[in-house]
Amino acid sequence: FPGSTDRYLSSWGVQQAIEQYNPTVVKIRDRKLEVMRAHMDSKEKVRIQYASKFARTANYWKYYIGQTKGLKRMNVYDQKKALEDQFTAWVNVSDERVEKYGEALDILADAYYDNEKINEVRIFLNEAVFQGAEVFYFIYRIQDAIKNLPEDPKAKRLAINELKDIAREHFKDYNKNLDQDLFAELMELYNDNVPYSKQPDAFEKVRKHNYTKGDWHKFAAYVYKTSPFVSQSKFFAFLERPSVYKLEKDYAVRMFNSIMNHYMDKISEKRREVRKNLAKGERLYIAGLREMLPNKKFYPNANSTMRLTYGQVGDYTPGDAMHYDFITTFDGLMEKMDNSDDEFMVPERLQELYKAKDYGRYADEDGNLIINFISGNDITGGNSGSPVLNAYGELIGTAFDGNWEAMSGDIAFENDIQRTISVDARYIMFIIDKFAGATHLIDEMTIAPNRPRPLSAEEQAAMDAEDAMNDPLTIVNKLSTINYLGQEIPVIEMHSFGSAFDLAVAQFGSDSNTLFYWRGTVYTTEKR
């Protein structure tokens, strides 16, 4: 199932994404990546522990950078604003429309104004707390269970064992020093970027404390020295004699609860009101648009529901002097091999298969092994692994990503340059069969027959013209013409000059005075 799109986002929503939401997320993740990278570069064990965490953080860091660039490049704000201006003019034509839809855009404008005032607090809660230092999320998971430990000894022992299981999973890929630096850097970022009037009480206490005096690294050092929630051994020792008093006095717990209580007391209700008004404004606006543009098809966002998307495999040109083909091959994979970089490592077995060109039945007609292909399908987050079917209903690949230019696609889809990236089914089967040796899985599959490659539009036109040349019913007036020196001459659209010349001779005869036009040049039909 896909995640979510927001294709009918208003101009205020686009502006807020570009100017506030996206850059704030990027700023926080930028700092988080810097901290992780520094520790990962210093120790191999830490690099292995945090490789997937780093990748997850970088994924949406890059996504929001790309989305902002795409929205600006496509002038999405201006497009949305123009449609809203058109809508306003349409509404004001009649009192009935004003009564029905007149408040729609005002509701949206007011809701986004209110949202802007609380947005940073919400972003920092999500990005710097729940996805920041892992001590916060660990506290979130375990503190209620500690406060509600059963009195019965047997039940209490079972509850403590469950807490230990949570801790083992939590601390499996965890580094205390890295987490301490994350705590310091992200709390400092929170302190420096959210106005003091919108901050939890704990931040002012850290700024004014005689020991820390606003030094977040000093505060973090104290927290990670004294808290039982920053290492597995300390937590297990705490569970020997669990104490709600010690829990509530812990500085990491107090910081987390201060942030959460502030959000629930000061922000949560305002956020609910914003969401309610946004929903009302959007319902009115979309209903009005459908009435204003009765012939336009308005497809739903269909968030988190099963949906189908269709497209064509094809290349694209994202900018001047830039062009990307529609496939990548094993040759390209080997060109990028760098076994010092996790993202570009090629296992030895795969290298051996490449050197031997042992592709089996998975090579294409030219002997190449296709790895990925791109298409104009419209996908979003959550579509990784979605099957890609051809016109015959056969599985030809699985979608796993979008191109850089597609990062703005959740808000605005542009068919010319936004592409879905899919892994070719032949490469999947090659890995299962040749690389992994799991032939029993291949034996269970029904393999589709080889089919001829569909002709391109140019090739199809050439074939049609060739057929027409041999058709006695084909006459000159079926060809388009251009004016050349006052004379209408036929345009021959053929793949090659030879084919174009043969068709012209067949139609008009061989003559030095008979002209035809092919690819920007005028020729005679005279045979020499």
Residue positions per predicted region:
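Terminal leader/tail segments of proteins
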Residues: 471-514, 518-528
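Terminal presequence/propeptide segments associated with secretion/organelle targeting
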Residues: 1-473
